[in-house]
């Protein structure tokens, strides 16, 4: 005789579906060494649409005492806002955001350098991008003392940190660039272009 599955009774007297029961059982097996609070935190992390008490994030939360929330409470009515994003993004997302930030900085610096090289353009034409320093900065509060920011040496520079010469020389030695005249593979194409005329003989 086939057995029929019944919905399991919830602790609060309600019923849960078999799928939710299986998820709870799986979480309890996977995180058996965690306390009740920790399991709720894991559930919230795994299912961001569910609050700690099991209610949907965009619905009316259930209360353990059965009373409704106060009238002035922002959770009394269903929220029409989209759910907020996770406060702890994944490492892939962090890396992507960092690359995007660096790429936008690089594109901005390249556009500024191109605008500086082409000059002001035609008289009726708007300037595509302003220079890095648009107005002098006042240092110390006195209107007479004016100094540019530390990183405003050149608009083509992305990072204005000084490079340590020892580190740079160790990279040159490590990459073998100090033996550039001895390595013919670094001079490929010299028949097509006259590179030797461009560089001083001491290099």
From Swiss-Prot:
It holds the Pfam family CITED. Keywords: Activator, Apoptosis, Cytoplasm, Developmental protein, Differentiation, Nucleus, Phosphoprotein, Transcription, Transcription regulation. Disulfide bonds: none annotated. GO terms for biological process: apoptotic process; brain development; labyrinthine layer development; melanin biosynthetic process; melanocyte differentiation; negative regulation of DNA-templated transcription; negative regulation of neuron apoptotic process; negative regulation of osteoblast differentiation. GO terms for molecular function: chromatin binding; co-SMAD binding; LBD domain binding; protein homodimerization activity; transcription coactivator activity. It is found in: Nucleus; Cytoplasm. A motif (Nuclear export signal) lies at residues 168-177. Its main location: nucleus. Residues 61-84 have a biased composition (Low complexity). Expressed in calvarial osteoblasts. Expressed in nulliparous mammary epithelial cells; absent in pregnant mice and in lacting mammary glands. Also expressed in mammary tumors (at protein level). Expressed only in melanocytes and testis. Expressed at high levels in the strongly pigmented melanoma cells but at low levels in the weakly pigmented cells. Homodimer. Binds to RBM14. Interacts (via N-terminus) with HSPA8; the interaction suppresses the association of CITED1 with p300/CBP and SMAD-mediated transcription transactivation. Interacts (via C-terminus) with TOX3 (via HGM box); the interaction increases estrogen-response element (ERE)-dependent transcription and protection against cell death. Interacts with ESR1; the interaction occurs in a estrogen-dependent manner. Interacts (unphosphorylated form preferentially and via C-terminus) with EP300. Interacts (via C-terminus) with CREBBP. Interacts with EGR2. This is Cbp/p300-interacting transactivator 1. It comes from Mus musculus (Mouse).
């Amino acid at each position: 005789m086939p057995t029929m599955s019944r919905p399991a009774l919830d602790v609060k007297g309600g019923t849960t579906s078999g799928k939710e029961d299986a998820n709870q059982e799986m979480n309890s097996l996977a995180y058996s060494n965690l306390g009740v609070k920790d399991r709720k935190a894991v559930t919230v992390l795994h299912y961001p649409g569910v609050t700690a008490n099991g209610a949907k994030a965009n619905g009316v939360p259930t209360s353990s005492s059965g009373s409704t929330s106060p009238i002035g409470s922002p959770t009394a009515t269903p929220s029409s806002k989209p759910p907020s994003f996770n406060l702890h993004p994944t490492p892939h997302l962090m890396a992507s955001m960092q690359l995007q930030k660096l790429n936008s900085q690089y594109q901005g610096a390249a556009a500024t350098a191109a605008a500086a090289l082409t000059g002001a353009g035609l008289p009726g034409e708007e300037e595509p991008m302003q220079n890095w320093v648009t107005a002098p900065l006042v240092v110390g509060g006195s209107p007479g003392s004016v100094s540019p920011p530390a990183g405003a040496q050149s608009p083509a520079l992305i990072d204005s940190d000084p490079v340590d010469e020892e580190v740079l020389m160790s990279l040159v030695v490590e990459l073998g660039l100090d033996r550039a005249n001895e390595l013919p593979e670094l001079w490929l194409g010299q028949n097509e272009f006259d590179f030797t005329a461009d560089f001083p003989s001491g290099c």
